[in-house]
Amino acid sequence: SLGLVGSEMCIRDRELHSVKVTAKNAPTLFAGCPIVCEAFDEPDQKALLVETLLATCPDTTIVSGSGMAGMGSANTIRTRKALERLYLCGDGCTDVATEGSLASPRVGVCAGHQANMILRLILGETEP
């Protein structure tokens, strides 16, 4: 629990920014963040953030949601380590464009996977 206490303090010390995240400002906005939880709705925004942080913030690990649209089984949502510093949570294939919409139960399951992976990373566990 000592790791969590230190991380909570770190989170409280962060500044809030009300800005649009761009490739230009993302490295500054997320500088010094050991873990970033990506939760954008739009695929292009997700890609921009993930690609920018992987390229410019070598000490940052990203936990991203991908594939949670529709009313399919929540049991298809999982967490996988895609790259050394990138974890993907979701089913990896469903999309709002094909499924029509997001459903809050599947979004909640995916968010739970993201939160769990982030806690595991804080505790030093790197495998999903």
Q: Could you describe each region identified by the protein language model?
A:
Residues 1-6, 10-11:
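Single conserved hydrophobic/aromatic residue that forms the stacking wall/gate
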Residues 12, 23, 126:
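A Rossmann-like FAD-binding core segment of flavoenzymes
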Residues 14-16:
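Hydrophobic/aromatic anchor residues within beta-strands of the central parallel beta-sheet
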Residues 18-26:
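Conserved SAM/SAH-binding loop
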Residues 29-35, 39-128:
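Glycine-rich phosphate/adenylate-binding loop
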